[in-house]
Amino acid sequence: MEPVTYEPIGVVESTFSKPEEVPRPSEEFVDASGTVHIEPQYEPGLKGLEEFSHVVLVSHLHRVEETRLRVTPIASRGEVGIFATSGPVRPNPIGTSIVELGGISGTELSVSNLDLVDGTPILDIKPYAPKMTDLDELEIGWMG
């Protein structure tokens, strides 16, 4: 298989300096605010994003130092595979975060409910629209 390479489109400015400072979603609500700084050449791609209340940040979890294929989530009944979780210790440390979009000023996005460490590279931004993914029958495995 050919290697895959991505260039970040921006970086996160956050109050969290270490991964262990970020609250785990299953333990408490993440109420941190921050800024996503987008590289100037990508500013035209932000047009229309201000119409959404929430966005999905796709990130490279640059501070993750290990990979595990089996983990024990707090809310689970035991060990599960990493692909059955949203945990960060993945073979490819790619994260997705749904954040509230407070506003856009030039190449800066003000966001809240941010669960990323300061300096996290952003690979992509997508509007969050639950109706696009609303499924009639949804099984949520051990999370249910």
Where are these regions (language model features)?
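Glycine-rich, low-complexity intrinsically disordered segments
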Residues: 1-144
